[in-house]
Regions:
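Sec-dependent bacterial lipoprotein signal peptides
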Residues: 1-21
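Extracytoplasmic low-complexity, Pro/Thr/Ser/Ala/Gly-rich segments
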Residues: 32-79, 93
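A short, structured surface patch at a secondary-structure boundary
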Residues: 68-69, 74-128, 159
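Bacterial lipoprotein signal-peptidase II cleavage site
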Residues: 19-36
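Extracytoplasmic substrate-binding proteins
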Residues: 56, 150-223
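Structural recognition of the beta-strand scaffold that forms the well-ordered cores
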Residues: 67-69, 87-90, 136-139, 156-159, ...
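Short helices/loops that flank or line small-molecule/ion binding pockets
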Residues: 122-134, 151-152
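Stable alpha-helical elements in mature extracytoplasmic
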Residues: 73-76, 82, 125, 141, ...
Length: 223
């Protein structure tokens, strides 16, 4: 199962149309003068718990080696300046909707061998994932063996729109995008960065009507 196209379109359109410079590199990070461990723990929000479909995942530190199935959550990771956490990707990625910088980063991520699914998407064996020392897979249940990975200590995070147990989404409410940003920010210990991004995204969508041109215009499209 792949990300619901309406939600993917909203997220990708916003990711391509905005650039938050320096959101992942603070003055402290550049200078090496970081906060105390207690302060860092508090600001990171750990331990953080998020739902991955029906499974509750708890993170005590940021994932270091991430596998992406196709480009699941790639726009969100890009906007949060977290693509450097992705060690491998599997499946095809259509980079035509991304800005040049993000597309270049995605293409540079090493590709892991997978099997194309008849319903779309890609499947990767547990052995391949463990051999690559992956600690988090961002994707969908059809692509991996969730239970086998859990036994090996590897988490599978699936966005809400990828879950079979969720009520089908017929209308892509913008709240789904900001909710996903919040969840990914929690997983990687950057809740403040996620909050800042959500504020910017909400402002951007609120400003859309101001930029609409033409007599009788009553709608603006994000995708």
């Amino acid at each position: 199962m792949k990300l619901h196209p309406l939600i993917a379109g909203l997220t990708l359109a916003l990711a391509s149309s905005m650039c938050l410079t320096g959101c992942g590199t603070s003055h402290q990070e550049k200078s090496g003068a970081g906060p105390s461990s207690a302060t860092a723990s508090a600001s990171s929000g750990y331990p953080a718990t998020v739902m991955s479909c029906a499974e509750k995942l708890t993170f005590t530190e940021a994932p270091k080696r991430v596998l992406l199935l196709e480009d699941t959550d790639a726009p969100t990771l890009s906007m949060l300046d977290l693509l450097d956490k992705v060690s491998a990707r599997a499946g095809k990625i259509d980079t035509s909707g991304y800005d040049v910088n993000t597309a270049t980063k995605l293409k540079a991520i090493p590709q892991m061998k997978g099997t194309s699914l008849a319903t779309g998407g890609v499947s990767v064996s547990t052995e391949s994932i463990l051999d690559a020392h992956i600690d988090l897979v961002i994707g969908y249940d059809l692509g991996v063996d969730r239970k086998a990975l859990a036994k090996a200590g590897v988490k599978l995070y699936s966005p809400d729109a990828n879950c079979d147990d969720q009520t089908p989404v017929n209308h892509a409410d913008f709240g789904l995008v900001t909710k996903e940003v919040t969840k990914v920010g929690a997983i990687f210990g950057v809740p403040e960065r996620a909050a800042t991004l959500n504020k910017a995204l909400k402002k951007q969508t609120a400003d859309l009507p101001k930029h609409a041109a033409g007599k009788g215009v009553s709608a603006a499209a994000l995708w």
